[in-house]
């Protein structure tokens, strides 16, 4: 179990089973664990005094041995249309991570970060510029959703795990977060309302498939051949495209779930007629959806987004050969909602 610098357990880093064992060791009755889980994960309390159906004695024990340490909102940015709010959360150790609230007609979606920084090195991503600092704990990921609900007063209905970090590089903590956010004692968000994005850690994709969670897996592809993907997405040097596609095929077979392939369009780099033909040939036999993404500009990078008319031609070709494809609706472009940008600007000023 995870402990902080004061050797206290952070209850939001535990799951129900671990809290049950902890409460049993305290000599308390089993139903107390269920009560505590609801306070911690559904109500999102920040103080043990708020757990009003627990005895004062038990609250005192919890205060002595555990913590409800939370990520706190440092700053936020609201898009001109008001449909996107970007939050910067401060962590207890002084680091910061970003989350984004996106308001859709079907509900509110929160994009969470899973690491401080990232070591994947994707060439057009701001999150990876200074490398990986550390993994987030399950509670630190969960706090992003709780904090946004608390700040806005609006229920979160969908989770997108595509903020800073590679989720499958923080596998166990992300799975525990998923368990808690989905649970009845938590926010009870359906697995089919959760999307997890990976740049292609093939062994972890295989492990995830065996869990048979009905989440949506999104694969950051961004290139249709190894030569180009080696440059844009360096993990491809370890797991080549044929290995990635095989892992995707196995994932579909085991889970029965359609995979989303993300393809960030970079002008003059991966958006030619030959690239779209290669992409179509690569994905034509898979149960999949292709999400074309006009890339967000990053100050330290020189990439330019593909012009709209070329994006449309790219989309039309894929559709013509029978593939399911959409162009991602742009939210929050005016507030630099691309991963990592708000954090880096904040840290440069502080």
Curated annotation (Swiss-Prot):
- Where does the record say this protein resides? Cytoplasm
The record, for InterPro entries, names: Aldolase_TIM, Elp3/MiaA/NifB-like_rSAM, Methyltransferase_A, RlmN_N, RNA_MTrfase_RlmN, rRNA_lsu_MTrfase_RlmN/Cfr, rSAM
Q: What class of enzyme is it?
A: transferase
Q: Which domain of life is it from?
A: Bacteria
Identify the main location.
cytoplasm
**Segments forming domain Radical SAM core:** 104-334
Q: Where does [4Fe-4S] cluster bind?
A: 118, 122, 125
This protein's cofactor list reads: [4Fe-4S] cluster
* Keyword field contains Secreted: no
SUPFAM superfamilies listed in its UniProt record: Radical SAM enzymes
Q: Which UniProt keywords apply?
A: 4Fe-4S, Cytoplasm, Disulfide bond, Iron, Iron-sulfur, Metal-binding, Methyltransferase, rRNA processing, S-adenosyl-L-methionine, Transferase, tRNA processing
For biological process, the GO terms are: rRNA base methylation; tRNA methylation
Cysteine disulfide links: 111-339
Q: GO: which molecular function terms?
A: 4 iron, 4 sulfur cluster binding; metal ion binding; rRNA (adenine(2503)-C2-)-methyltransferase activity; rRNA binding; tRNA (adenine(37)-C2)-methyltransferase activity; tRNA binding
Q: Name one GO cellular component term.
A: cytoplasm
As recorded in UniProt, its EC number(s) are: 2.1.1.192
Q: What else is known?
A: Reaction proceeds by a ping-pong mechanism involving intermediate methylation of a conserved cysteine residue.
- Protein name (database record): Probable dual-specificity RNA methyltransferase RlmN
Which species? Desulforamulus reducens (strain ATCC BAA-1160 / DSM 100696 / MI-1)
Q: What is the lineage of its organism?
A: Bacteria, Bacillati, Bacillota, Clostridia, Eubacteriales
Gene this chain is encoded by = rlmN
């Amino acid at each position: 179990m995870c402990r902080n610098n004061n050797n206290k357990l952070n209850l939001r880093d535990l799951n129900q089973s671990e809290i049950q064992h902890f409460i049993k060791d305290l000599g308390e009755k089993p139903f107390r664990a269920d009560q505590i889980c609801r306070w911690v994960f559904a109500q999102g309390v920040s103080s043990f005094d708020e757990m009003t159906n627990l005895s004062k004695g038990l609250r005192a024990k919890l205060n002595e041995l555990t913590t409800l340490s939370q990520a706190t909102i440092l700053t936020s940015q609201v898009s001109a249309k008001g449909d996107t709010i970007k939050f910067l959360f401060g962590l207890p150790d002084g680091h910061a991570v970003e989350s984004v609230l996106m308001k859709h007609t079907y509900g509110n979606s929160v994009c969470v970060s899973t690491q401080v920084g990232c070591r994947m090195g994707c060439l057009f991503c701001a999150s990876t510029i200074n490398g990986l600092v550390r993994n987030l704990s399950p509670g630190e990921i969960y706090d992003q959703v709780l904090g946004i609900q608390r700040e806005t007063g609006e229920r979160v209905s969908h989770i997108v795990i595509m903020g800073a970090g590679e989720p499958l590089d923080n596998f166990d903590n992300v799975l525990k977060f998923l368990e808690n956010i989905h649970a009845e004692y938590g926010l009870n968000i359906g697995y089919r309302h959760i999307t997890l994005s990976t740049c292609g850690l093939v062994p972890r994709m295989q492990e995830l498939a065996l869990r048979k969670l009905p989440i949506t897996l999104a694969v950051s592809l961004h290139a249709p051949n190894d030569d180009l993907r080696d440059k844009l997405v360096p993990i491809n040097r370890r797991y080549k495209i044929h290995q990635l596609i095989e892992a995707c095929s196995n994932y579909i077979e085991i889970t029965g779930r359609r995979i989303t392939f993300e393809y960030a369009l970079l002008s003059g780099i991966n958006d030619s007629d030959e690239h779209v033909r290669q992409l179509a040939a690569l994905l034509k036999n898979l149960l999949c959806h292709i999400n074309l993404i006009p890339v967000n500009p990053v100050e330290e990078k020189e990439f330019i987004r593909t012009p709209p008319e070329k994006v449309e031609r790219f989309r039309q070709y894929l559709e013509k050969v029978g593939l399911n494809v959409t162009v991602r609706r742009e939210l929050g472009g005016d507030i630099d909602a691309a991963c990592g940008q708000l954090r880096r600007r904040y840290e440069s000023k502080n």
